Amino acid sequence: MNHFPKLLSSQIGFDVAQTMLEYFDRHYRIFREAAVDAKTLFERGDWHGLQRLARERITSYDERVKECVEVLEDEYDAENIDDEVWQQIKLHYIGLLTSHRQPECAETFFNSVCCKILHRSYFSNDFIFVRPAISTEYLENDEPAAKPTYRAYYPGTDGLAVTLERIVTNFQLDPPFEDLTRDIGCVMQAIDDEFGHFDEAPNFQIHVLSSLFFRNKSAYIVGRIINADRVLPFAVPIRHVRPGVLALDTVLLRRDLLQIIFSFSHSYFLVDMGVPSAYVDFLCTIMPGKPKAEIYTSVGLQKQGKNLFYRDLLHHLSHSSDRFIIAPGIKGLVMLVFTLPSFPYVFKIIKDHFPPPKETTRAQIMEKYQLVKRHDRLGRMADTLEYSSVALPLARLDHALVRELEKEVPSLLEYEDDKLVIKHLYIERRMTPLNLYLQNGSDADVEHGVKEYGNAVKELMKANIFPGDMLYKNFGVTRHGRVVFYDYDEIEYLTDCNVRRVPPPRNEEDELSGEPWYTVGPHDIFPETYGPFLLGDPRVRSVFMKHHADFFDPALWQASKDKLMQGELPDFYPYDAALRFSVRYPARFGATGENDGAGDAQRAA
């Protein structure tokens, strides 16, 4: 520190620090209670309750921050506390965290509160946690009644089948399994199919995280197999095959499959973690290369993920020299998008003004982004990180980008010494725009992209999402080849839309008209009219009609809306339906097995 306090003499400093930690502890207690409730809701098959719980948990953090800020302002006149006391507040807070089990998350909470009270000129390590102060290495909950982060199992003692069954039954799920012996046999067959015969080394063991990961209609067992110097990841989704009866749906044994279920395009898991850093460290061992920021976000600690991401950005800026540039591709009417080529993300800013035909406001667009944050993204909508007062070094901004910023978003800019402060922006994973992917791709790429696009829109439809603007430029292709939607300014709930057929033309003049001859309400959608915008390229048209000819039939859209209006929640799988045991090993299921994965079995990733 520049002016390190020699004595922690301020009682107010201690009281403020203690109050802030009390509100963080309240937040984390609610966070853990949500994961415990998720287990109960999963056991009951209360899918609507699980959706509601996930939505409520997302807003809980900001509610606790708001409550804490109000208390500090009312009881301690926080805005007028002097600099030396603020430094003491941070030091007292560090002292209170020395034996805390979520210190990194508590530091982030401290930052969130301070950023509501202090001017951004105080956003330095003197006053907030620009860098972490408390180490999380080897952190564990050592209370006698506490669950360990993970449990170790040794198949060499009792055999693999017995060990796998013990792993499943140790989670003590209330509903019975349809046939756990059958399912364990499927797991062993899948392991054999993937790895073949292998010799068991003396250290052969299985590590399993002690809490289940809940999302959608699944509960995931997550762990790793260790044999000699190999570390093999796995995840086993548990699902209801019918009300009150469970089954192991598959086992995912490849790192890329785990990276997909933990990806930025899926909703956050509900998982009970006494020591979140220990869970994240474990997940890093089975998904090396995946940023910790993304892992924290995927397990529901999105504010911690956001904090780590910003630290990653600052670190990258200090170790790179390229410039931020306008993102390649077709410019949007609503958002200004730029990127740093050496950093795999895009930065999106809502423009000050929108040209016709756009009729919207900044507040409406921000609400659309919140809608996506709260909604089940199913692996088909990109998550966004929302930031305020982001300071970027002017020397790293391309001149063309600066001119574009000054033209399109002058109200959001503030020059501060050698930095440009952007008052509000969103950050997303960078993807290849689907229109460029189709334009530049091989025939095989076009087939893959078009098939994925149709699947993505149909899955969003079943999840009650109408994308609005469905042009290819509003979708991206991830590094795993998945098509993901990322332009949200026209997004609507499908249940709020009026699906219509185009009325027949009344005469030849109507037929030749370039304008609709029928009235169009603000929520009317006409699937029959999408063809001219999507099928202009002959290669695309051929593949589209091969895989998704029903896309332009209003009956498809209306059927999804009707099911949603009846309260039906379709099944979605963040892995190929062909991996499901009932599909992969049908002989093991016989007449009692599930169907072949058609119908509601949708691939959501």
Curated annotation (Swiss-Prot):
Keywords: ATP-binding, Cytoplasm, Glyoxylate bypass, Hydrolase, Kinase, Nucleotide-binding, Protein phosphatase, Serine/threonine-protein kinase, Transferase, Tricarboxylic acid cycle. Its EC number is 2.7.11.5, 3.1.3.-. GO terms for cellular component: cytoplasm. This is Isocitrate dehydrogenase kinase/phosphatase. It catalyses: L-seryl-[isocitrate dehydrogenase] + ATP = O-phospho-L-seryl-[isocitrate dehydrogenase] + ADP + H(+). It comes from Burkholderia orbicola (strain MC0-3). ATP binds at residues 327-333, 348. It is found in: Cytoplasm. The gene is aceK. GO terms for biological process: glucose metabolic process; glyoxylate cycle; tricarboxylic acid cycle. Belongs to the AceK family.
